[in-house]
Amino acid sequence: TYIDGDKGILLYRGYPIEQLAEKGDFLESCYLLLYGELPTQQEKNDFDRRIMQHTMVHEQFSRFFQGFRRDSHPMAVMVACLGAMSAFYHDSIDITDPQQRMIASIRLISKVPTLAAMAYKYSIGQAFVYPHNSLSYAANFLRMCFAVPCEEYQVNPVLTRAMDRIFILHADHEQNASTSTVRLAGSSGANPFACIAAGVACLWGPAHGGANEACLKMLKEIGSVKKIPEFIARAKDKNDPFRLMGFGHRVYKNYDPRAKIMQKTCHEVLKELNRQDDPLLDIAIELEHIALNDEYFIEKKLYPNVDFYSGITLKALGFP
């Protein structure tokens, strides 16, 4: 990944993130990141088929989940499940073997959505939904999360595309905290599943993967558009611990290119679900307007980042 923070540019293997998010799908970006080039149509078909052949997880995982409380944080569950994968797939735990590393990569890409959906289903007391390999990667994930046995699940192309974009935008971001954690764990010779579990544990932090959750919590705390000036004043007050979440980035000193894509995606999802009047979106739009025109934010280069709209989008999709 290449980032130019001053110009607001993000490239995956030389390709602009805007191009990949608009014209491709997540598995195409996975192929690009793994192999360095975009796939031909035949290579893409073969790669998709290979991923879909590995979407099932060992049936023992169903019993593994029973050891968790229903109200466990999903990231805690994911850390445990990813670490446990090394106990189930012994033929791909040698990190020094390139072939085993690739098999582990394929398995992780394939099985993480299944495990994440299982974690969600377990938390709400619903039956697990097995993967359906005729569906796309994103559609399969949404179905595993939200399908119920008593009715047929209808794939919504707008929501599926939104989920796909969320996956693409978060696929890679240079040497960030979780990537550094994975590489550090790997430097000790730890198996790939343990390394990824360590990375997910790092991603759990509120300053990293938890930022969109914190941003959504902030919008709820503000409560209404009328109260925005009060919170803006608090954000400017050095003696007030309140911080505006979803603004600014350690790398980007310009508008986060992922935020523009996420903003468009958020509007598409809310329109599809007939929720354009969502009060959280009204607050977000007004906050963004103020931040882009207020001298304080301009001087400090506090532009909206990808977390600003992704929390609202995920909430609208049905994730708690």
UniProtKB/Swiss-Prot annotation:
<dbReference type="InterPro" id="IPR016142">
    <property type="entry name" value="Citrate_synth-like_lrg_a-sub"/>
</dbReference>
<dbReference type="GO" id="GO:0005737">
    <property type="term" value="C:cytoplasm"/>
</dbReference>
<dbReference type="InterPro" id="IPR036969">
    <property type="entry name" value="Citrate_synthase_sf"/>
</dbReference>
<dbReference type="Pfam" id="PF00285">
    <property type="entry name" value="Citrate_synt"/>
</dbReference>
<dbReference type="InterPro" id="IPR024176">
    <property type="entry name" value="Citrate_synthase_bac-typ"/>
</dbReference>
<dbReference type="InterPro" id="IPR019810">
    <property type="entry name" value="Citrate_synthase_AS"/>
</dbReference>
<feature type="active site">
    <location>
        <position position="249"/>
    </location>
</feature>
<protein>
    <recommendedName>
        <fullName>Citrate synthase</fullName>
        <ecNumber>2.3.3.16</ecNumber>
    </recommendedName>
</protein>
<dbReference type="InterPro" id="IPR016143">
    <property type="entry name" value="Citrate_synth-like_sm_a-sub"/>
</dbReference>
<feature type="active site">
    <location>
        <position position="307"/>
    </location>
</feature>
<dbReference type="GO" id="GO:0004108">
    <property type="term" value="F:citrate (Si)-synthase activity"/>
</dbReference>
<comment type="pathway">
    <text>Carbohydrate metabolism; tricarboxylic acid cycle; isocitrate from oxaloacetate: step 1/2.</text>
</comment>
<comment type="similarity">
    <text>Belongs to the citrate synthase family.</text>
</comment>
<keyword id="KW-0816">Tricarboxylic acid cycle</keyword>
<dbReference type="GO" id="GO:0006099">
    <property type="term" value="P:tricarboxylic acid cycle"/>
</dbReference>
<keyword id="KW-0808">Transferase</keyword>
<dbReference type="InterPro" id="IPR010953">
    <property type="entry name" value="Citrate_synthase_typ-I"/>
</dbReference>
<dbReference type="InterPro" id="IPR002020">
    <property type="entry name" value="Citrate_synthase"/>
</dbReference>
